[in-house]
A protein has these predicted regions:
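Structural beta-sheet core signal
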Residues: 59, 85-87, 155
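N-terminal amphipathic/basic-hydrophobic helices that include classical n-h-c signal peptides
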Residues: 1-21
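Short, structured loop/turn "capping" segments at alpha-beta junctions
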Residues: 137-141, 168, 174-180, 246-251
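Canonical P-loop GTPase G-domain recognition
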Residues: 93-152
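Glycine-rich phosphate-binding P-loop
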Residues: 153-172, 202
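Conserved active-site beta-strand-loop modules that form the wall/rim of enzyme catalytic pockets
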Residues: 117, 167, 197-200
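Short coil/loop residues immediately preceding or within conserved phosphate-binding loops
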Residues: 148-150, 173, 188
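Helix-rich effector regions associated with P-loop NTPase G domains
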Residues: 19-56, 64-73, 77-83, 90, ...
Length: 311
């Protein structure tokens, strides 16, 4: 296949900035996936100060990357509180992988539920899980004559894991703002779920530095890092390389392309652009449009049920 002029330029760009063949930008993470706006530092303080108001913690992670989407700093802050982990977006994650994660958490003494907060699937198990996790608190309240006292949970997680969708489902009213982009909820809010459960919603918060570049990659793949601070073309190339190594059949089936084995990300992106007819003046590939399609369709689960990490 003859690579187009623009394809050739993009290939050079990719080699320099993505592969580190020229010592200008040594790795993907340092250039594209580091995002910690000022309000997140404030959020960390608010979470720490609010812990004495709750009995337990609900952490929402992305079922496709449970480890990478769990903020280690939040984990350290809330470790003394009973915790429930919601593996959200499990509808687009590999079900076998999700089952392994649930078993993993169980061995750690943590209750984990596979859910889809937008549709509500799996959330019928949430209230019983709350009462099971805080059975000792319920018993103490009853002995003190406060059997009707609500159990309070703080809801935490990184941006774009589905906290607002969860709150809306459980509160029964569309009170929390829902948008498929990182960094929407910006203040602590209380919501009642009924059944004696109250939830304290908190804004999504990342941590200042991703020590493992692959963690930064994965967070950008699922949209937990704002697209406006990433290079979407470079990001899509990296995503395609990861998926080509693990799920090549899904790429070929979704985009009606073949022979991607051994190709670099930009080459696969070019194939996708041609097949989809993403062209600009002169018949050149519109890489920006192709990149947006790849990232959006992965996030929406249109390539199939994919998990990017196992316990």
């Amino acid at each position: 296949m003859t690579v187009s002029f623009w394809g050739g330029l993009f290939a050079l760009y990719y080699v320099i900035f993505m592969k580190g063949s020229v010592n200008v930008m040594p790795d993907f993470q340092k250039r594209y996936v580091q995002w910690f706006p000022g309000h997140m530092a404030k959020t960390r303080r608010l979470i720490k100060e609010s812990l004495n108001l709750v009995d337990g913690v609900v952490e929402i992670v992305d079922a496709r990357i449970p480890a990478s989407s769990s903020n280690p700093e939040l984990g350290a802050m809330v470790k003394r509180k009973p915790k429930i982990v919601l593996l959200n977006k499990s509808d687009v994650a590999d079900s076998a992988a999700t089952s392994r994660w649930i078993d993993y958490y169980k061995k750690q003494g943590v209750t984990a539920l596979a859910v889809d907060c937008r549709s509500g699937r799996g959330l019928n198990k949430f209230i019983p899980a709350c009462k099971s996790v805080l059975a000792d608190v319920l018993e103490k309240n009853e002995k003190k004559g406060m059997a009707g006292k609500s159990l309070r949970f703080m809801v935490v997680g990184i941006p774009n894991t589905g906290k607002s969708s969860f709150i809306n489902r459980m509160a029964g009213k569309n009170k929390a703002v829902v948008e498929d982009r990182a960094g929407v909820t910006r203040s602590n809010q209380w919501f009642s779920c009924g059944n004696g459960i109250e939830l304290l919603d908190t804004p999504g918060v990342l941590w200042p530095k991703f020590d493992d570049p692959e963690v930064g990659d994965k967070l950008a793949f699922i949209g937990s890092v704002k697209d406006t601070v990433t290079d979407m073309e470079a990001l899509s190339c990296r995503l395609l390389e990861v998926l080509a190594a693990t799920h090549p059949d899904m790429i070929e089936e979704r985009y009606k392309i073949t022979d991607i084995d051994g190709l670099q990300g930009w080459e696969i992106l070019e194939k996708i652009g041609k097949e989809r007819g993403f062209l600009i003046k002169g018949g050149e590939i519109n890489y920006e449009r192709a990149a947006a399609a790849v990232c959006d369709e992965f996030r929406e689960g249109k390539l199939g049920r994919i998990s990017l990490e196992l316990p």
